[in-house]
């Protein structure tokens, strides 16, 4: 599941795997207010994500098919201004090692970071959403 702090899938986002979460702090929530949520569909195929240094798919580009715990070590940039999800579903994290704010990306084009709900272009890590059972 992907939980959202505000209605219409806005505000802080929280990715939850199957399990029990008796307290919002156990899923790294900043508060206990959830106003919208969505199921992340199962994806059994391959994964492909292209990240770009600048908006509108400009600047340096790298393509990934695996999780990346430290974007800066692979991409040499701390900021990602646009991306294209070619296959699979992905979670972007604001800080390295899958920490900080989370952003759910479905297949499609994201021409600027605000389109995935971020307030800054900072991306420290990302991972594939894989089968969770």
From Swiss-Prot:
Residues 42-46 are annotated as: Connecting peptide. Residues 1-41, 47-87, 88-130 form the Beta/gamma crystallin 'Greek key' domain. GO terms for biological process: lens development in camera-type eye; visual perception. Keywords: Eye lens protein, Repeat. The keyword Repeat applies. GO terms for molecular function: structural constituent of eye lens. Crystallins are the dominant structural components of the vertebrate eye lens. Belongs to the beta/gamma-crystallin family. PANTHER family: BETA/GAMMA CRYSTALLIN, GAMMA-CRYSTALLIN S. Monomer. There are at least four genes coding for non-identical gamma crystallins in this multigene family. Has a two-domain beta-structure, folded into four very similar Greek key motifs. This is Gamma-crystallin 1. The lineage of its organism: Eukaryota, Metazoa, Chordata, Craniata, Vertebrata.
